[in-house]
């Protein structure tokens, strides 16, 4: 029986991917549907995608599938047909092909079974996730963008909103979708008669959010079909003006797709115009933040003087510094105060 998980080091896998001569295509997709045996479905699909040399991140739950993958261009059609055949509910699945792609987005296939394909924190047995809002195509999005009675609501995290968003969209200031759902209901409680247009990267979050809004008494709820990725593609194909400004953050090695030339964010260290996310080079920190080329050189890719100094230590000393440190993804919003302190070296005692 084949091993149904990766057993090769990330370093070696990344080197193999970078050595490939054939270009890859980055694709994202999701679908809400009922799976009676998520683990069995996961294992079967893992075998199929591994045979096709597909890399990426795939989450499977009883409520469906959520995936971001990369595939060799010569195997794209075979991958698509394999997905369509994997389950009757996946036949005709929409595949969001990346807009700004160097083919280096993933180098390993990771597939996990989870309680939900997107963590929503909803624990209400009366909630019907199928009762979604109206899907909007690109031309309909633009029409509503010019409608003073329409409110565009960004259902992405703050660091995604920071580098790009629909014009005049409302930010739900949080780091997680789970936190945003109760927040958006509260923030818009006096706007139930308005047209609520929800959007996200590829559609998975705003689709569920639209059902949640309807569950909470909002009547005129819409969501952008296929998210920002599909909207931008269709708008360009149809010659429509883009109502989204800046960059679309993505959760892979690219960390962003350029939608318009506008740079609306700023370096988190010096304040210069910049929308390039990076992770702190200090592996004991790995903070996600925006850093301009000047600061990248000055801080050697680190988020702070403290991390820069720690990175210069022998590996054994770096490991001792990391011991007991909080694990998990760190992003600038949660670490703003620490970052400001560490830029001046004042948080050394905390490290």
Swiss-Prot record:
InterPro entries assigned: Rhodanese-like_dom, Rhodanese-like_dom_sf, Rhodanese_C, TrhO, TRHO_N
Superkingdom of the organism of origin: Bacteria
Ranges for domain Rhodanese: 146-240
Reaction catalyzed: uridine(34) in tRNA + AH2 + O2 = 5-hydroxyuridine(34) in tRNA + A + H2O
Pfam families the UniProt entry points to: Rhodanese, Rhodanese_C, UPF0176_N
Enzyme Commission identifier(s): 1.14.-.-
Keyword Transferase among record annotations: no
CDD domains, alphabetized: RHOD_YceA (cd01518)
Keywords: Oxidoreductase, tRNA processing
Molecular function per GO: oxidoreductase activity, acting on paired donors, with incorporation or reduction of molecular oxygen
Biological process according to GO: tRNA modification
Active site: 200
Class of the enzyme per the UniProt entry, highest EC level: oxidoreductase
Alphabetical list of PANTHER family matching this protein: TRNA URIDINE(34) HYDROXYLASE (PTHR43846:SF1), UPF0176 PROTEIN YCEA (PTHR43846)
NCBIfam families with a match to the protein in the record: PRK00142.1-1 (NF001133)
Cited function: Catalyzes oxygen-dependent 5-hydroxyuridine (ho5U) modification at position 34 in tRNAs.
Similarity comment text for this entry: Belongs to the TrhO family.
HAMAP family according to UniProt: TrhO
Protein name: tRNA uridine(34) hydroxylase
Species the sequence originates in: Sodalis glossinidius (strain morsitans)
């Amino acid at each position: 029986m084949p091993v149904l998980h990766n057993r090769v080091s990330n370093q070696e896998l990344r080197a193999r991917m970078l050595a490939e001569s054939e270009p890859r295509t980055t694709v994202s997709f999701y679908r809400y549907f009922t799976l009676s045996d998520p683990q069995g479905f996961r294992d079967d699909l893992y075998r199929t995608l591994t045979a096709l040399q597909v890399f990426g991140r795939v989450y499977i739950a009883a409520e469906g599938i959520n995936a971001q993958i990369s595939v060799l261009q010569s195997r794209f059609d075979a991958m698509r047909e394999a997905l369509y055949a994997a389950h009757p509910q996946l036949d005709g699945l929409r595949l969001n092909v990346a807009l700004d792609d160097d083919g280096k987005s993933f180098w390993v296939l990771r597939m996990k079974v989870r309680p939900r394909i997107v963590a929503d924190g909803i624990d209400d047995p009366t909630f019907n996730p199928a009762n979604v809002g109206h899907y909007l195509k690109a031309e309909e999005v633009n029409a509503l963008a010019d409608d003073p009675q329409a409110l565009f609501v960004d259902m992405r995290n703050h660091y995604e909103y920071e580098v790009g968003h629909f014009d005049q969209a409302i930010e739900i200031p949080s780091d997680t979708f789970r936190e945003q759902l109760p927040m958006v209901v509260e923030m818009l409680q006096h706007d139930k008669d308005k047209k609520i247009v929800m959007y996200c990267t590829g559609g998975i979050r705003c689709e569920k959010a639209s059902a949640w809004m309807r569950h909470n008494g909002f009547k005129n709820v819409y969501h952008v079909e296929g998210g920002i990725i599909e909207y931008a593609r269709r708008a360009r194909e149809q010659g429509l003006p883009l109502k989204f400004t800046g960059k679309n953050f993505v959760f892979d090695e690219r960390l962003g797709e350029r939608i318009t030339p506008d740079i609306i964010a700023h370096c988190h260290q010096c304040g210069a115009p910049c929308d390039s996310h990076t992770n702190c080079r200090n592996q004991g920190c790995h903070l996600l933040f925006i850093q301009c080329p000047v600061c990248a050189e000055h801080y050697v890719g680190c988020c702070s003087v403290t991390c820069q100094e720690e990175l210069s230590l022998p590996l054994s000393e770096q490991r001792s510094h990391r011991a007991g440190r909080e694990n998990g993804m760190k992003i600038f919003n949660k670490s703003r105060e620490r970052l400001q302190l560490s830029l001046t070296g004042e948080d050394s005692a905390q490290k």
